[in-house]
Amino acid sequence: MNRIKDFFRTFLLFELIKGMMLTGRNMFARKITVYFPEEKTPQSPRFRGLHALRRYPNGEERCIACKLCEAVCPALAITIESEQREDGTRRTTRYDIDLTKCIFCGFCEESCPVDSIVETRILEYHGEKRGDLIYTKQMLLAVGDRYEEQIAKDRAADAGYR
């Protein structure tokens, strides 16, 4: 009996008809189109865009040069050099992120013990030359300073899940 059913399903192209019905149903459904530069879709607080380095409220940079983000980066996009300061703490002298290599996975953000490196909601950035997409420590700190309010809001919204 099952052989007969299988024969008719195969002979009558049941799967093909089922697929054509699905296509026909969606062909006449309302289209959803977002005209991107003019219209923007809502973003999640967890959106992974352009990187930023944060500072403490007293103005000191948060990065303690533990190099966990450099070690965990699967694309090897982060380069860190550090020095010992006179007070015994370690701070970065060089912190570069090559955005041409970065895959925006967020591992650097997750591994940071002091919430220094974060990924912002910024997705519109460009470079005219390859070197323009290598962000230095000063550039990352400038992004962090400029968007600190939004970063703090996003971190607060996500705090319950961390």
Swiss-Prot record:
GO CC aspect terms: plasma membrane
GO molecular function, one term: 4 iron, 4 sulfur cluster binding
Binding site for [4Fe-4S] cluster 2: C73, C102, C105, C108
Chief subcellular location: membrane
Range of residues in the leader sequence: none
Class of enzymatic activity (EC top level): translocase
Record's bilayer topology term: Peripheral membrane protein
Superkingdom as given in the UniProt entry: Bacteria
A Pfam family recorded for this sequence: Fer4_7
Keyword ATP-binding: no
Known EC number: 7.1.1.-
Gene Ontology biological process terms, A to Z: aerobic respiration
Functional note: NDH-1 shuttles electrons from NADH, via FMN and iron-sulfur (Fe-S) centers, to quinones in the respiratory chain. The immediate electron acceptor for the enzyme in this species is believed to be ubiquinone. Couples the redox reaction to proton translocation (for every two electrons transferred, four hydrogen ions are translocated across the cytoplasmic membrane), and thus conserves the redox energy in a proton gradient.
Xref: HAMAP family: NDH1_NuoI (MF_01351)
The protein's name: NADH-quinone oxidoreductase subunit I 2
Species this protein is from: Nitrosospira multiformis (strain ATCC 25196 / NCIMB 11849 / C 71)
High-level lineage: Bacteria, Pseudomonadati, Pseudomonadota, Betaproteobacteria, Nitrosomonadales
